[in-house]
Amino acid sequence: MEDKEGRFRVECIENVHYVTDMFCKYPLKLIAPKTKLDFSILYIMSYGGGLVSGDRVALDIIVGKNATLCIQSQGNTKLYKQIPGKPATQQKLDVEVGTNALCLLLQDPVQPFGDSNYIQTQNFVLEDETSSLALLDWTLHGRSHINEQWSMRSYVSKNCIQMKIPASNQRKTLLRDVLKIFDEPNLHIGLKAERMHHFECIGNLYLIGPKFLKTKEAVLNQYRNKEKRISKTTDSSQMKKIIWTACEIRSVTIIKFAAYNTETARNFLLKLFSDYASFLDHETLRAFWY
């Protein structure tokens, strides 16, 4: 099956955002509503609310100079079970972030159904050191109403962040991170559900660029202070419901978290952005509302 292509480009001209290119084919669906906000919003969806076995989706996005783009979804992206004889469901996203531009990939979590097989690849290329990016990659355990607990066949998510080298066609890699969830019987380490220790939501948040400089410093300082590292993002009733860690690698701040329920994860992320990235419009945090 050939890749289903999609393209999207947004430019900022005299402080006004214009969508200059948008194209998609089934099963991909793109919506860029007109708003009075000082940034552009792109909803990435699929017909039926999910991806079926064998789907292969490829989307290219360009965020022009000085532009701000918030990429969202309308609800969880469902991953349906793999049909015998069909290849893994695949989704590829390539994003270029221009000079002094900001890209926010803050979608709802992916929801893999039982026996699904999914490979996600997300590549981000920053124009220079003035480009900023917030990338959230998170997933759920399955469908709670039928007691699915990490019963997908395989879930793989690959993230790569690069920056262009001035006066050169080359790029330097700032981050490569891969999340793999599958059973490994040969290692005798237990099934996926056993290894996840009842966590229902796990994810990674990556921050880079000058627009998140203060955010990154605040998050890292909070984490270093072990006695107070949870106090500003979770109250005492939530301390046992979520665990998280933070570090910085080649100017990319990485926040990894695991929560016992989705609501706790949403609240954690909402508080984190509200406390440490208050410059973001509340509309950009729609994925954390509940």
Curated annotation (Swiss-Prot):
Its main location: cytoplasm. GO terms for biological process: urea metabolic process. It is found in: Cytoplasm; Nucleus. GO terms for molecular function: nickel cation binding. This is Uncharacterized urease accessory protein ureD-like. GO terms for cellular component: cytosol; nucleus. It comes from Schizosaccharomyces pombe (strain 972 / ATCC 24843). It comes from the Eukaryota. Belongs to the UreD family. Probably facilitates nickel incorporation. InterPro entries: UreD (IPR002669). Keywords: Chaperone, Cytoplasm, Nickel insertion, Nucleus.
